[in-house]
Amino acid sequence: MKTFEKSSAAFNRAKPLMPGGVNSPVRAFKSVNMDPVFMERGKGANIYDIDGNEYIDYVLSWGPLILGHADDQVVEKLKETTEKGTSFGAPSELETKLAELVIERVPSIEVVRMVNSGTEATMSALRLARGYTGRNKILKFEGCYHGHGDSLLIKAGSGVATLGLPDSPGVPETVAQNTLTVPYNDLESVRYAFEQFGDDLAGVIVEPVAGNMGVVPPEPGFLEELRRLTEENGTLLIFDEVMTGFRVGYHCAQGAFGITPDLTCLGKVIGGGLPVGAYGGKREIMEQIAPSGPIYQAGTLSGNPLAMTAGYETLVQLTEANYEYFDRLGDRLAEGLSAVAKEYDIPHYTSRAGSMVGFFFTDKKVKNFADASSSDLEFFAKYFKEMLHLGVSLPPSQFEGMFLSTKHTEADIDFTVDAARQAFKRLKK
């Protein structure tokens, strides 16, 4: 069994200095009932904690590290860029290089604006949707996470397509009432929302594959009908591809599903592990943003040289062949985990979208947040701890998927599946 003495000491030192001792809630490991593990370094598909323990990593910084940790080319180019200066507060050619690559590969994006996080991207996209349409309301889906902006930290009201309620203290009810929340994959609720509020509906924002309630792909026809309804109503369709961008496919989820939204939000992979976000779309919409148009958005570090370098050097290495590899590797992982769960009669459901794999401890097909919430969270916490001690780093939440990188191998997958077999054997005693 691994020991975490140094991590425990580090957490005790951090707790009085930062809320909960961390800078993002899921890192606190509360949902798995243990103190967080403090990491020191990573290389390829492996990560190492401050106690010297080694793990195969399926967190990958929550998705950005599609080339694995400390990719040689990314690191070398970052060193070169750093020596020239870390930030200028002025345009650089690095921004243009990354913008060209994003526009080339993302079907919906004709013009792109770089920002510093996925939350900035979604907040800015909503402001743009409202400013462009002259409408106020936004439709989102239960279980889809779009960052921590006030307009998006909203839960559903008591009835279908009712006005939203704040999902966090500090979010004013007046803000929440302009956000409608309906179940993911539920077209009947979407149609009802359009019937009731269509005249004031500025945008529909959706993760084309929901990645923050596990990995939940869209049901056949779901995205197609969202596209039809929004076009018919003059509402903007916004794909939040902060997580799915360049993970679900070479041309992102929209390319994989053949659905082109009006606006797309990106992050994670396009920063190669550095803080970044972006939003883009049709030229006629994007030209409403300052300084081209009247809708304001700005950022001191937007388009900074380091993030642009890491993003460009990441994307330029990705090829169509990588995504074929992810399909093979992802299937091997999902099918392997399912097989060992069946060996021990453990209720489960697996899902996959590109290099994202979901593994739920429920006997339901997971197609929305209610289904995901039926998972056995207590069992997941025990499974997480067993896997950690066996050398596998999983996201510390049942509602997060596993991420693959180009550095993961079939041997890594087989090791992980065997670890799951050992974990289930212990847990079923």
From Swiss-Prot:
Copy the pathway line from the protein's UniProt record.
Porphyrin-containing compound metabolism; protoporphyrin-IX biosynthesis; 5-aminolevulinate from L-glutamyl-tRNA(Glu): step 2/2
Q: Where in or outside the cell?
A: Cytoplasm
* GO molecular-function terms, A-Z: glutamate-1-semialdehyde 2,1-aminomutase activity; pyridoxal phosphate binding; transaminase activity
Please give the superkingdom of this protein's source: Bacteria
Reactions this protein catalyses: (S)-4-amino-5-oxopentanoate = 5-aminolevulinate
Enumerate the CDD domains for this protein: OAT_like
E.C. number(s) listed in UniProt: 5.4.3.8
Hey, which family's this protein in? Belongs to the class-III pyridoxal-phosphate-dependent aminotransferase family. HemL subfamily.
**SUBUNIT field:** Homodimer.
The record's annotation in HAMAP family points to:
HemL_aminotrans_3
Protein name, per record: Glutamate-1-semialdehyde 2,1-aminomutase 2
Q: Say which species the protein is native to.
A: Halalkalibacterium halodurans (strain ATCC BAA-125 / DSM 18197 / FERM 7344 / JCM 9153 / C-125)
Which gene produces this protein? hemL2
